[in-house]
Amino acid sequence: MIIGRVDEVDGHFVATKFVAFAVPTACLYIAPKSPRTTVAGANTDGVLIQTEWRSVALGYARVWLPLAALVLPLVEAAVFGGLHLVTVLASVVLLALAVLAFRAGRLPEEEKARLRVLGTVTGLRIDPSKLMDATRMIKHASLGDLMEKGGIPMSPEGILSVLDDIPMPAMPLVYGFACYAGDDREWRECAARCYERYQQGDI
């Protein structure tokens, strides 16, 4: 059973596969069926990613909190023949927490817009830091081939030195390459600058 849906962008989302709603076995990136999302690490359920603890926690909360809210008063009524105010209040609190759990895990519109840009060049609307290393490396190599064909530098310093000269249609590619290249400070700053320029041209 796949539950704990978070970070949804245009039908793409992160979720967790559970056994009997109790044991999390894998976190997955799930996308609408498309040849572009057929990547290393994919199976019939989705693309295997690193453990996303928000998805795991919300998966538990969305299943067990409403169940506990319903079962608690039923058990007390069956065992003791009536309900105490404390039990009723506890059920209300559990239901309120369940509602919050279903509303949690949404991305702000700014982040959705950023992930859409990545999706235009990779097919994946997910931050590369959440992917398995093998999946990330394959996507990075693919983007690198396109960068090389376009004669665009492939180091953070090189990219920034020609940033203003890169044609706007190529900016999603350059931004995607910088995001997939690594999580160290130089690449993060390079990616941020690339995205800033893309936004300026997109206005």
Annotate the PLM regions.
Residues 1-203:
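A composition-biased, non-transmembrane "mature-region" signal
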